[in-house]
Amino acid sequence: TLPFPLPEGQVELGSYSGGYGSKGSYATGEVIGTNRVRFTSSKPLAPNEGLTIVVSWPKGLVAEPGMGQKLRWFLADNGAALVLLLGLLIVFTWYYLAWDRVGRDPQKGVIFPRYRPPHRLSPAACRYVLSMSFNKDAFTAAIISLAVKGQVEIEEEDKEFTLQRKPGEPLALLSPGEQAVLNTLLPLDSSRIEMDNKNHERFQSARKALTKALKKEYRGRLFKLNGLYVLGPIVVSIAAAVIAAFFQGGPAVWISYLVLVLLLHLLYAFLMRAPTPAGRVVMDEIEGFKMYLGTAEQDRLDRMRSPQMTPELFESFLPYAYALGVENTWCNRFAREMPREVRDQSGYHPAWYHGHLHGMGALHHLGDNFSSSFSSAIASASSPPGSSSGGGGGGFSGGGGGGGGGGGW
């Protein structure tokens, strides 16, 4: 039954019957009355067979919907996608404008070799400021700095490490972060601790104490995270998802939105971090110092007129080399430039490290294997124990695409 009368002699009937995709038919159709048609099959339909009917009439018999109706249909079918797309555009625009305002880094200065670290910056602070974030390398550098400064002895046996506090050593040369690590990890003069995850709570507390001290000293003064600028886009992205939930939207729409919006948040959370003008100057100094520590070629060192290598100079800068990732080059340079009197006295013997290697073997070990094994031990010690749609038109059986005279406005 159709909702309007059919013009006599201007109606065409057709049908397709059989299995999916069949072009044949064993059904006939006829017009009954002014608005009814009937189709009769000459034999029963077998399992998995279907009947598709086709009724067509002259164009203009049914009024074509206006633009308003088409727009309403379009919004009903694609409302969720449009709302989410608008949300993404707002989030991106917000982030870009915020980044353009506060997230652009000041222009980097000229980087040239510097023979001293920036004034009053500890190794952990150099790592923290240069990366504008805290990571395990800063914690590793802080412990090695405590050892080099005579506060801690590092004992290694079969890649197992133990830290022993040395009593009576002055604390004046320690940075606030290093003091926080020492007081948390080894609070008493004779404290001793194995770098094992059974002691993870103390290592985690020491790591948090170092992070807190570094944040207090340098965040906001040398660099800014500009985290408040991220809150608005997060609210917009959540609001867009809530509004879109009232419209139709398939899984592909939601998955695409979640992936894109998360990428935007992560990208701009990183890009919004920016050094202050004073911080950019300090970063340039750190990079210049790293250039000096990481230079291996002798001719370049000669042109740089670098200071004469001594055991004292080597040890004082070794924690910085660990912090900046150039410890191998720094240790190899000392092995090559080691003063003759040190070689004649059976090589280098660090007072703060006790392991199975001595002399030149210990020196090469500090550069090659110690960094990775010690960092892995710290990471381990800081962690708790193991802890669809239907067939479209096209005129075949089961397709359902011929009925209603498709397209005949």
How would you describe each model-predicted region?
Residues T1-F74, L86-L89:
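Intrinsically disordered, low-complexity linkers and stems that provide flexible hinges
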Residues F74-L86, A244-L263:
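Hydrophobic alpha-helical transmembrane segments
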Residues K23-S25, G60-G232, A269-E315:
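Short, amphipathic alpha-helical interface elements at domain boundaries
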Residues P65-W73, A239, V253-L263, W352-Y353, ...:
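Extended beta-strand-rich architecture
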Residues Y229-A245, S256-H265, K290:
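Hydrophobic membrane-spanning alpha-helices of multi-pass integral membrane proteins
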Residues H200-S205, A209-R219, S237-I238, L263-W409:
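Short hydrophobic helical membrane-anchoring segments positioned at the boundary
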Residues T34-R38, D158-T162, A321:
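A generic structural signal for beta-strand entry/edge sites
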